[in-house]
Design a protein with these regions (language model features):
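Local sequence-structure signature of Cys/Sec-based thiol-disulfide redox active-site neighborhoods
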Residues: 1-25, 29-34
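Thiol/selenol-based redox catalytic cores and closely related redox-interacting motifs
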Residues: 36-117
Length: 117
């Protein structure tokens, strides 16, 4: 089986629940605290491709950083969105679970089963 990574924030219930589902399935993923180890622009592009989503679809529009910095004006500009994700990593949707060339957002946490089945 390919290694599994999780972009994780232990402060958030969905992230903890997704991690627990992986562990309950006897999978110990590589845990990346994306707030401390912020993905590079190349990593963000790769994640976007693996999710098969434009970055505007996996940012948290309800986050303070998103609202306070008027980031909505960049929804059609991938580079500016990636730059914003690097500068304000809290706007990155979480958790993101990656396996090989596929990734899912663990909202709801059970989405992880589509990746590990």
């Amino acid at each position: 089986m390919s290694e599994i990574l999780i972009l994780h924030n232990s402060r958030w219930g969905k992230s903890r629940a997704t991690l627990q589902l992986l562990r309950d399935s006897n999978i110990e993923p590589i845990i990346i605290n994306y707030l401390l180890s912020v993905p590079s622009i190349d990593e963000l592009r790769s994640i976007s491709k693996k999710l098969n989503l434009h970055p505007s679809r996996w940012i948290r529009k309800s986050e303070k950083d998103y609202k306070n910095n008027n980031l909505g004006k960049y929804l059609n500009d991938e580079v500016k969105l990636y730059d914003a994700m690097i500068k304000y990593p809290k706007i990155i949707e979480r958790p993101i679970v990656i396996k090989g060339d596929k990734a899912i957002i663990g909202r709801p946490p059970e989405n992880v089963f589509t990746l590990i089945k």
